[in-house]
Amino acid sequence: MSFELITRTYSTSQKPIKAIIAIHGWEGDEYVFEQVAKLISLENSEWFFPRAPYRTDSDNGNSWFGGNDEDGWKFEKTFDGMNNLINKIRTSGYSASNIFLIGFSQGACLAIDFALRLPFSIGGIIAIAGFIKFKERFLKDATKESTRTPILLMHGNQDDVIPVKAGKTTNDILVEKGYLVHFERYDAKHKIPLKKMNLINKFINDPTSIVKSKT
């Protein structure tokens, strides 16, 4: 039985061209990214804000991965729901090259883990304060087609939740795997950088202006 994620939408146009899936972090919900979407101020876009399907152990919010390191992790609902969401977006008329994923913290982890398993490339990934949690599984499951998906990694130098070293490690893994990546560091803690909204806007409008091709 397929799983549907609770999802809100926000559009900046009656005929949007680009679709952006905004993936909240740990304990977040489908409302936390809307203000960020408005600050990015992207024309001709439709935003999709899904809610993570699992509750945190403390029951204070939502999580994309259920369980823990000792008992094991559950993520079937997450990947099933994300697959259904991206398929609906494509069926509604968006080309894969105009679909972007943006995620923060645990949401950035999911954006990378999910998008790079797809049997096709998408417009791009923006991973803020992210990391690769399941490295061995990622290295095994990442598809050749997904290496054409440009990636913008962003990480605060003073991040005390997910250290910037995790962002650097993620960058190194992706580059070694053949992905085109730009790693942007900024002076902040564990937060979405308001001063980098223009960079995100520019990346979504033209990823090649940020992520340079190797050829």
Region annotations inferred by a language model:
Residues S2-A96:
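Serine-hydrolase catalytic machinery in alpha/beta-hydrolase-like enzymes
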Residues Q35, D113-R117:
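Active-site signature of alpha/beta-hydrolase-fold catalytic machinery across serine-
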Residues D59-G67, F131-P150:
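Flexible "cap/lid" loop of the alpha/beta hydrolase fold
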Residues L101-G103, I128, M154:
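Short beta-strand immediately N-terminal to the catalytic nucleophile in serine-hydrolase-like folds
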Residues I102-G107, A111:
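Gly/Ala-rich beta-loop-alpha elbow adjacent to hydrolase catalytic centers
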Residues F120-I132:
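A conserved short beta-strand
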Residues L152-H155, D159:
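Short beta-strand/loop motif that positions the catalytic acidic residue
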Residues K165-N171, V175-T215:
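C-terminal catalytic histidine-bearing segment of alpha/beta-hydrolase fold enzymes
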